[in-house]
Amino acid sequence: MNAFVEEAEAVSTAMSVEDKAKVTKAGADVFAKEVEAEYKANHYRHRVTGEDPHLADSVIVQNSNVDGMKNGNSTVGFSKDKAYIANFIENGTKRPMYTSKGRKYKRGGQVAINGDHTIENLRNNPEVMSKVVEAQAEAYKKIIDKRNKQ
């Protein structure tokens, strides 16, 4: 019985950082495809942008955390050039209330862009999360099968 418990702990809690990164990367790739599809469906204009890619084409996946440290996490986001645009779409904007000199603007505080909350809605969507979990389970199964062969 103890051998079974030790084997289960070795597979689950004692995973190496590389194995955790493989599992989370599989889920992050699926989520990135969903983000790209959602932005293409709702915010894409079919026009020639030249060398400047559209926001939907700027979704990136990195196999590290937000700070760039490899600890088994994977991050989905946008390139540096487009992240601020995604923030405007996600959260919306308001006009400033006061000028730099402290005077109040005529229409201060009015909403200029309504937030779309695309990424938040995708995170809360059970269909998308089930796809992410399935991809992670497939990667996890490959790691377990590889360990069992050794």
Where do the protein language model's features map onto the residues?
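Short, Lys/Arg-rich flexible segments
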Residues: 1-73, 98-150
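Mid-chain, well-packed structural core segment of small domains
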Residues: 67-92
